[in-house]
Regions:
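Amphipathic alpha-helical segments of tetratricopeptide repeats
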Residues: 3-11, 45-51, 87-88, 149
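Start-of-helix signal in alpha-solenoid helical-repeat scaffolds, especially tetratricopeptide repeats
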Residues: 13, 17-20, 60-63, 67, ...
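Flexible helix-coil transition and linker loops at the boundaries of alpha-helical arrays
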Residues: 4-16, 51-56, 111-115
Length: 166
């Protein structure tokens, strides 16, 4: 309950996105333990999250979690539609040549990090997630490793590589 904002504040809608990777892993664990209904409820909750500009800035790979959740729920056509959307978004990211980090450079990045390097790391990570969603783990790990070399703070890239090793 501590993670839930009071409805009267009309805020916190996007904070749920930050919990998606953990909820997804929990759903997978529940499914492995035979708790199918609980797992399906979590996958449905992930799929029910709308995608908007704010959510995509908080968790750009939300669509990838939704793709895999949709597949696990048996909704292949919808998963395929989201997969194509993600691939299109990554293609746009690869073409970005602006002077800042996707047209807006937060002040701390402009003093600390090379925007082109950050953009490249973000793009590599989104490619990794796209391959993961498509079930192509070798390609996913290659892009995750590339992203991690450019930005060592990408903790979920590290988790992906560690999980692939085990």
């Amino acid at each position: 309950q501590a993670l839930c904002y009071p409805e009267s504040l009309n805020t916190g809608a996007w904070n749920g996105a930050l919990q998606v990777p953990v909820q997804f892993k929990l759903a997978d664990t529940l499914a492995m333990l035979g708790e199918t209904k609980e797992a399906e409820n979590l996958w449905r909750a992930i799929c029910a999250m709308g995608q908007d500009a704010i959510l995509e800035s908080v968790l750009p790979e939300l669509g990838c979690y939704q793709i895999v959740a949709l597949r696990r729920l048996g909704h292949e056509a919808e998963a395929e539609r989201l997969q194509k959307r993600h691939e299109s978004r990554v293609a746009q990211m690869q073409l970005a040549r602006d002077s800042g980090y996707y047209q807006a450079t937060p002040f701390f990045i402009s003093y600390c990090e090379d925007a082109a390097l950050q953009r490249s790391a973000a793009t590599s990570w989104q490619q990794a997630m796209g391959y993961w969603a498509a079930g192509k783990m070798n390609e996913a790990c290659a892009h995750a490793l590339h992203a991690l070399k450019q930005d060592p703070t990408l903790q979920y890239a590290r988790f992906m590589l560690e999980e692939a090793e085990s």
